[in-house]
Amino acid sequence: SETEGNPGGSGSLHGFNYEFSRLYEPEMEDYSQSLLDNAEGFSETAIVVIGRVSGESNDSPKVQYKNCSGTGMPDEQYIDKTRTYLEISTEEEALLEYVGETYENVIVLINSTNVMELGFMETIPGLDSCLVVATTGSAGAKAIPGILYGDINPSGKLADTYAYDLSTSSTYVDTGTGNDTTNFY
């Protein structure tokens, strides 16, 4: 059934849950200097995991809903209409810029049920590698350390194209309901 947080209702072509699509990445100012110093002292390599979840009856919105309190549709101040759910957020971008400047090696893991825009891998200096791990499950999570240590070769063929900019796809314009906040892809 349709609710405030799930327009269109569960199973609807135009349904999703605002809570489910909300991004909870802290801002760089939220990390203490002590935490950042300890992490840098621990390793020359930073591993950053970018995650998104969407799919049947929980489509990806064309805006980003940020961390806030309450349920249902977030206040306007918590909606970033300049970025889609499948792009990195401003908070993730700041984190990636920080680790790109600070660490000798930076590995980005994409833990997403959908194809994300990966153009940031070319535009943010210092990002060395990117591995799409999809939704790992228990077997996939066990394989990641072997891949990172070089014991397992993750080569394979992708069935999807990972675009620099999803809006350049001809299908992007013709999906969803047609307004800026509930047009899904």
Provide a role label for each language-model segment.
Residues 1-185:
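C-terminal non-catalytic regions of proteins with extracellular/luminal or membrane-system context
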